Amino acid sequence: MAHVITRINAREILDSRGNPTVEVDLETTLGIFRAAVPSGASTGIYEALELRDNDKSRYLGKGVQQAIKNINEIIAPKLIGLDCREQKKIDNMMVQELDGSKTEWGWSKSKLGANAILAISMAICRAGAAANKTSLYKYLAQLAGKNTEKMILPVPCLNVINGGSHAGNKLSFQEFMIVPVGAPSFKEAMRYGAEVYHTLKSEIKKKYGIDATNVGDEGGFAPNILNAHEALDLLVASIKKAGYENKVKIAMDVAASEFYNIETKTYDLDFKTPNNDKSLVKTGQELVDLYIELVKKYPIISIEDPFDQDDWENYAKLTEAIGKDVQIVGDDLLVTNPTRIEKALEKKACNALLLKVNQIGSITEAIEACLLSQKNNWGVMVSHRSGETEDVFIADLVVALRTGQIKTGAPCRSERNAKYNQLFRIEESLGANGSFAGDKFRLQLN
């Protein structure tokens, strides 16, 4: 029996930062299926276009009424009557025919907006799962050609200390995450993570005062930390005090594009200070040396965006130096774009993809980016954005794609915990057919 799309309606809702975003209700003969898209703060210049209205009299220019209009008036009429199980066909139709905009890196979604296309793409996945009488994670696994019997629960990468563009402190690196690789299950990994988080909170309160325990966009803390060493010392002490030494490791997201000077080709580790300390302006090679030093001193297992999104040379240097032991993740470098991934493979620039569905703008293309990375023995980390909604789609996606790792904030703030709570449910429903990635998180490739 065909399960056709009978109605599509888009609306403007608010994300976790109070900015507008797109939500879609897609109706089939089986009911209404809803999806909402997230939005990033530190965005890569090569991401597919997130369409904003730029009408300064409304939401400071961040409204998404044009994207809503594009869905309701351009996309919806073309999709009514199509079978909701035709995911690839519908995604390709929206991206290539209805939008059709391109750059040298592929389909850019600059006509209709990646936020418009993705909201429908996600809702269609939910409708397709219902039509196939299966869960969303199993349906997504089928779309990706993955094993649907034995499935992998991811290691959570919990962002607990914030810096960079996410925080008002002096810290240049954007995220410091705890990664409970030594836990026996996802449920226990979250317990380890939550206990370290609360231990860290009390340590920060003692050292920096109660104001420093206010949380940022992703639920992490932003105490007045000056540099990476101070942040890492604080994490190591908190992990030890919570009783999880050797079981909880550390990951960093540097977001180095945010403090790169394109003219001088240098990195300013004091970029948030008006009269910056010139000794903290580093060359690419000096930054390579700093990462090598940090990895020797601290239990760091993953570094994301260590250099600018166009600094292929230093990415390759770092990957060659420490890539065997440390995951080097491309986010702004790759923007979940298969063409950028091909270039990174050719240049041996990194060894892992950060998968953000809204960077590329359709589920079909996101799956393609993941499969290309896994085929080349890269790790893949599924990720949220700093502006999130209560939508839990990425929790199902990470299990479906068997990537073994997810980052979706601290164990705090409901839009972050919504994803982790969905993973608790999935782990429970899988029972003996689900296994936790643990310290093999880089190897979930089948």
UniProtKB/Swiss-Prot annotation:
One Gene Ontology biological process: glycolytic process
Residues where Phosphothreonine is found: 339
Going by the UniProt record, its keywords in alphabetical order are:
Acetylation, Cell membrane, Cytoplasm, Cytoskeleton, Glycolysis, Isopeptide bond, Lyase, Magnesium, Membrane, Metal-binding, Nucleus, Phosphoprotein, Ubl conjugation, Vacuole
**GO CC annotation terms, alphabetical:** cell surface; cytoskeleton; nucleus; phosphopyruvate hydratase complex; plasma membrane; vacuole
How many cofactor units bind, and how?
Binds 2 Mg(2+) ions per subunit. Mg(2+) is required for catalysis and for stabilizing the dimer. Unlike for mammalian and yeast enolases, Mg(2+) is dispensable to form an active closed conformation. Inhibited by high levels of Mg(2+).
Q: Where does Mg(2+) 1 bind?
A: 42
Q: What is its main location?
A: cytoplasm
Residues the entry annotates as binding substrate: 166, 175, 304, 331, 383-386, 407
| Magnesium is among the record's keywords | yes
UniProt xrefs under HAMAP family: Enolase
Q: What does this protein do?
A: Glycolytic enzyme that catalyzes the conversion of 2-phosphoglycerate to phosphoenolpyruvate. In addition to glycolysis, involved in various processes such as parasite development and invasion. Plays an essential role during ookinete invasion of the mosquito vector midgut by mediating the interaction of the ookinete with the midgut epithelium and, further, by binding to mammalian host plasminogen in the blood meal, whose conversion to active plasmin promotes the invasion process.
- Subunit structure of this entry? Homodimer. Forms a complex at least composed of DegP, ENO and HSP70. Interacts with G-actin. Interacts (via the DKSLVK motif) with mammalian host PLG/plasminogen (present in the mosquito blood meal); the interaction occurs at the ookinete cell surface and is required for ookinete invasion of the mosquito midgut. Interacts with A.gambiae EBP; depending on the Plasmodium species, the interaction is either involved in ookinete invasion of the mosquito midgut (P.berghei) or is dispensable (P.falciparum).
Per the similarity annotation, which family is this? Belongs to the enolase family.
Q: What is this protein called?
A: Enolase
Provide the species name.
Plasmodium berghei (strain Anka)
This chain is encoded by the gene named: ENO
